[in-house]
Design a protein with these regions (language model features):
Chain B
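Residue-level signature of transmembrane alpha-helix interfaces in integral membrane proteins
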Residues: 87, 134, 139, 170-171
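Short, mixed-charge aromatic SLiMs
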Residues: 69-81, 143-157
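GST-like domain detector, emphasizing the conserved glutathione-binding G-site
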Residues: 1-109, 113, 127-131, 175
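Short acidic/histidine-centered micro-motifs embedded in hydrophobic/aromatic stretches
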Residues: 51, 75-78, 122, 162-166
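C-terminal helix/juxtamembrane-tail motif
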Residues: 3-4, 154-175
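GST superfamily/GST-like fold recognition
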Residues: 109-132, 136-150, 160
Length: 939, 175
């Protein structure tokens, strides 16, 4: 056979491959090897590409069967594609089939290839199937698709760039490339899911995609429909379960670190640092007021998104901005960076006006009232603002008008007549948030007048289909009015230049990059910056006296004016981009205003403004797998958290532990209880308490003499590694991941005490007693270190430990990068007592009921029915009316039952509120005017 | 030590590898990592196991023909995806049912040759098999026969408990 090939004149190097292919050819013809596929199964892609690569494509007998067909007799669940071999064996694993084609050609797999294939099966597939399901079956877009797979994509990208090889397993293509390419193709063929910053992944993907076997496989599997070709198949599959978020040690970047075995040098360095003791600590910055940037120092300006004044913030709002920013601010101060942390309430706008009307107060009175509520909530949560201001101040007017004048004189603003929605029944122009309708882009039924919650695109209220006044449900009419526009297209080039400089090497979160990039990709459009309102910053221009600036032009200027209220030298922070590093914290829905709108205003104003260096955006926190909802009484709101009897540090800990850092996460009562009882009580609290108790009980409260054995030295090195990782993560603002390091150190500590049993040794020989002393001394020093590391997360508990251990104030205020002996032999500690309390099941169940978690599904269902009924076209739909009537009846009996049981008043009130809401919807659906509640009751 | 690392140590002894390797564990699922002397670390139970087999010059345990090699790898993948991690009762029952049906006409997982697939499935299934009642053991008769056979294979069981299977059937009506 080989000879035959050579005679036909092929190159020598190709001889072997060809001969093998010829063998394969024979095999395929001789045997009844048959590939069973079904339309749109994702596994078809890699299998056909591998067959093509191995030259088997033409010879393969392919049978197309239905997705339910159980081709493999011994598997309960149907699995496709499947290769049936002539021996009767079945290959039902996609990579095993691919591997078989390669093996027939004589291509063996090395360790690295095997590792990639194992990773593909165990790590990539679970998250990829979620992403594909979201994209193809549920029609989701953007972050909902990307966030489940982001870590996996980053892992591939980093591996490729770290080894600087073009292929996964080295310089030449392997089975791993084909299998991973085939798995990822349906997703990555849409450039939206192949982020630019993953350059190595991008180039790998493109290299493979242009190869002939791959192209052919794509053509026959996806049939030019892209990922949608998988739809019919995936619809029939069970919805994949989102794999649990993994702790940081599973992060690709940390591969080397977690596989780390301690070297002699590391141990030696840890011992040296330990012995240096307190001398090695950095000097503590003297306290200043006001804090101002200092040349030559690291000047960190931190802002948290300004909460809207008339909403009481819920836990999702709190973790989304103020708490996350607080952890970073506290960490930044522990590092002795010159830090200023600011926030305040955002007070202007229609919502305030309306609220004022409702409560019979002036807008200013409403703002005063709610500003105080916010202040108290954040004080209770121990948020360490240097200043918590507000936007309704003269400084706000002055700075906003100054930026406006500069933009105007530089030609970045223009006037235009705007068609606006006006509700004749309410006789007012409708602000965006008072209009609802069908999204012109994605068809979502409940799009708001300014933005669609589903596709995230900004909307001009007038473009909404089937608009409705949210107050009276009347269809508004279009009237015209003159307005000012910010000419974003003119500023686009400057914005891109600035982003190009800023993004590289910065710590912007991936979702912030993604959202910003998608805005730029769609092209910027002019945005209206004025509104026909009274409660706002006045527009200083002839003909606009009765108008104010729209909040999204001036709310972000609030950061500047709040600083100006803090210090008259505010420009040292805000017009000093060379010396100031600006970190801005927010939830992802706020990103465009901070990454596009404000930077454009600031760049256009040409006044050397400080622009954001690191934009840190969180995903959303859900409540027990649903959404927080004030109107439905579902969820925990800032002011209620105080009444649960759970200390604020426990709330802080749990919210930070589940911080929606790279994907949405959920608040769950049971989980809160578990984390409190396992991580805080049994792990952290147990360790710190035992370490302190041993000092008190066995050594009279005096830290004993320590003589380090090799085991102790290794422990110090382990602790140092975790401490270093904690620093690395927090420098990148990976708050949730860094918390794991704290818990890991205390786990090390518990293990150390358990293995060395100081309580037994203290009763033994002289040597044993000395050993007990060393172990106790090292443990109590670890507790001291932990108290400082915990400070950003649980400031009160941290102070409690530091008081118990009598840690000197200078030591408490600075976190070193190494682990020195903080409590030397002879140091006298104070009185030690337990730090945490157990949360009991009954208590948690009670809270769950109180905050509506249990009724969530019910109310979601109702909501779905109700929202359908709200659409005007369906007003007279008898089916909708029947559904609503049923819902009212059902809710009515819920209320009666509760009353009969003499249930908690608040609970009854919540249910009654729901009933009334339903009745209103029913009345609307029937087209009746609203009856007074009493009349309804009699009916 | 994490379960996977322990299992790899058992495998080293079985293969007659003298120098004990050091393993660390990665992440919540405690995936084993092997730091090799001359190269980058290797991650994953199946990957490391195959590496050890090659190190011990016992390549026949990975299969001799293309077909056998693919079948071995398929069962190794089955081990790390289906047997590990999935621990709800229904999943386990389904898995045992499938395996029972598969093993009906086979001595070993690849058919007639003992391979790494048998070793890793034995280690992976041990924790489930020890908990089976006699009735269940008879229900999954082919799995029991295979398991009993493998646990008596020289050197494989080591400190793991020996699972007792009764030769005389106790439950005649179970299927």
């Amino acid at each position: 056979m080989q000879r035959g090939d050579r005679l036909s004149g092929s190159a020598e190097a190709e001889g072997e491959g060809r001969a093998n292919r010829f063998l394969l050819h024979q095999r395929l013809r001789g045997g009844g090897m048959r590939l069973f596929v079904t339309e749109g199964a994702p596994g078809n892609l890699p299998v056909l590409a591998a067959a093509g690569r191995a030259g088997a494509r033409g010879e393969l007998l392919i049978s197309t069967v239905s997705p339910e067909e159980r081709v493999v007799p011994f598997l309960t669940r149907p699995k496709l594609p499947v290769l049936k071999l002539d021996s009767g064996h079945y290959l039902f694993s996609t990579s095993a089939i691919c591997r078989y084609f390669f093996l027939l050609c004589g291509w063996e797999q090395d360790d690295l290839t095997n590792q990639w294939l194992e990773w593909e099966a165990t790590e990539l597939q679970p998250v990829l199937s979620v992403a594909l399901y979201n994209l193809v079956v549920q029609g989701k877009k953007g972050e909902d698709v990307l966030s489940p797979v982001r870590r996996a994509l980053i892992h591939i990208d980093h591996s490729l760039s770290r080894r600087s090889c073009p292929f996964l397993a080295g310089d030449s293509e392997s089975l791993a490339d084909i299998v991973l390419w085939g798995a990822l193709y349906p997703l990555l063929q849409d450039p939206a899911y192949l982020p630019d910053e993953l350059a190595a992944l991008q180039s790998w993907f493109q290299t493979l995609s242009v190869q002939e076997p791959c192209q052919q496989a794509v053509e026959s599997v996806l049939k030019k429909q892209g990922a949608l070709a998988l739809r019919t198949y995936l619809q029939k599959q069970p919805q994949p379960i989102v794999p649990l978020e993994r702790p940081v040690s599973n992060e690709p970047e940390e591969d080397e670190l977690s596989a780390h075995t301690l070297s002699e040098e590391e141990i030696a360095m840890a011992v040296t640092a330990w012995e240096e003791g307190l001398e090695a600590l950095p000097p503590v910055r003297p306290w200043q007021n006001p804090v101002l940037p200092v040349a030559g120092e690291r000047n960190v300006l931190i802002t948290s998104a300004l909460p809207y004044v008339n909403n009481v913030p819920h836990l999702g709002n709190i973790i989304g901005c103020v708490l996350s920013a607080d952890v970073f601010a506290r960490y930044s101060r522990l590092r002795q960076w010159n830090t200023l942390y600011l926030c305040g309430t955002d007070e202007y706008g229609t919502a305030t006006e309306t609220k004022a009307m409702e409560e019979g107060l002036t807008p200013q009175q409403i703002c005063d009232k709610y500003h105080a509520i916010h202040t108290n909530i954040y004080r209770w949560f121990n948020i360490s603002f240097d200043f918590f201001g507000r936007t309704t101040t003269p400084h706000q007017t002055k700075i906003t008008q100054d930026i406006f004048q500069r933009l105007l004189s530089r030609g970045f603003l223009f006037k235009d007549t705007v068609e606006q929605l006006r509700c004749e029944r309410c006789s007012r122009f409708l602000a965006d948030r008072f209009v609802e309708g069908v999204c012109p882009f994605c068809g979502y039924e409940e799009a708001r007048g300014d933005q669609c919650d589903k596709c995230g695109k900004l909307i001009n209220a007038i473009e909404l289909k089937k608009p409705q006044c949210k107050i009276c449900r009347e269809s508004p009419v279009v009237k015209s009015s003159q307005h000012l526009f910010l000419d974003l297209p003119k500023l686009e080039k400057r914005l891109e230049e600035w982003l190009g400089r800023t993004l590289a090497g910065s710590d912007w979160t991936p979702n912030a990059r993604f959202i910003t990039r998608s805005w730029l990709r769609d092209g910027l459009k002019p945005r209206c910056i004025t509104r026909d309102l009274k409660w706002g910053t006045p527009v200083p221009l002839e003909g606009f006296q009765d108008k104010v600036f729209y909040v999204w032009f001036d709310a972000t200027i609030g950061y500047l004016s709040i600083t100006a209220n803090y210090t008259d030298q505010w420009e040292k922070w805000w017009k000093n981009p060379e010396q100031v590093e600006l970190y801005q914290f927010m939830a992802k829905d706020n990103v465009p205003f901070h990454s596009v709108v404000f930077p454009c205003s600031a760049l256009g104003a040409e006044d050397n403004y400080t622009l954001v260096s690191h934009l840190i955006a969180t995903e959303y926190l859900n409540y027990e797998d649903g959404k927080f909802s004030k109107s439905r009484g579902v969820g925990v709101f800032g002011d209620m958290a105080q009444n649960t009897g759970i200390p604020s540090d426990i709330w802080r800990f749990y919210l930070l532990f589940v911080r929606p850092e790279s994907q949405d996460s959920s608040f769950s009562w049971t989980d809160l209880m578990l984390k409190n009882n396992s991580e805080l009580l049994n792990n952290l609290g147990n360790f710190v308490n035992r370490a302190g108790m041993f000092v008190c009980k066995f050594f009279g409260g005096c830290v004993p003499k320590m003589t380090l054995t090799p085991d102790d030295q290794r422990l110090l090195a382990h602790v140092t590694l975790e401490l270093r990782q904690y620093h690395q993560l927090l420098e990148k603002v990976r708050i949730r991941d860094a918390l794991r390091c704290v818990l890991t150190i205390s786990r090390h500590g518990n293990q150390y005490i358990q293995v060395n049993e100081p309580w037994k040794r203290i009763k033994g020989s002289e040597a044993d007693r000395h050993r007990a002393g060393t172990v106790t001394g090292v443990a109590v020093n670890m507790a001291a270190l932990l108290s400082i590391m915990m400070q950003p997360y649980m400031p009160t508990v941290s102070t409690t430990i530091q008081t118990q251990l009598q840690l000197p104030p200078a030591v408490c205020a600075a976190l070193p990068t190494n682990f020195p002996c903080l409590l030397p032999a002879g140091h006298q500690i104070g009185i030690v007592s337990p730090l945490f309390q157990k949360l009991e099941n009954d208590q948690i169940e009670g809270l769950r009921k109180r905050f509506g978690g249990g009724q969530l599904e019910d109310s979601l269902e109702l909501k779905a029915k109700v929202s359908k009924a709200e659409a005007p076209a369906e007003l007279a739909d008898p089916e909708q009316i029947k559904l609503l009537t049923d819902a009212v009846t059902k809710q009515g009996s819920v209320v009666r039952e509760l009353k009969a049981q003499k249930a908690d008043k608040a609970q009854v009130a919540a249910e009654v509120a729901k009933l009334l809401e339903l009745k209103q919807h029913l009345a609307l659906a029937e087209g009746k005017p609203l009856d007074p509640p009493k009349g309804k009751k009699k009916k | 030590m994490a379960a996977a690392a322990e299992e790899l140590t058992l495998l080293e002894k079985l293969l007659g590898l003298r120098r004990g390797n050091k393993y660390s564990a990665q992440g919540e699922r405690q995936i084993p990592v092997l730091q090799t002397n001359n190269g980058p670390s290797l991650t994953g139970l199946a990957t490391i196991a195959a590496h050890l087999v090659k190190q011990a010059n016992k390549e026949h345990l990975l299969g001799s023909t293309a077909e056998e090699k693919a079948v071995v790898q398929q069962w190794l993948e089955y081990r790390v995806t289906r047997i590990d991690g999935h621990s709800n009762k229904d999943e386990i029952r389904n898995m045992l049912k499938d395996l029972n049906s598969y093993l009906e006409d086979k001595v070993y997982l690849t058919g007639n040759n003992f391979t790494l697939a048998d070793i890793l499935l034995y280690y992976g299934l041990h924790r489930f098999i020890v908990d089976l009642t006699f009735q269940e053991k008879e229900k999954y008769l082919n799995v029991s026969r295979w398991f009993s056979h493998i646990q008596h294979y020289p050197g494989i069981r080591q400190h793991l408990s020996s699972v007792v299977f009764i030769k005389n059937r106790l439950y005649t009506n179970t299927h």
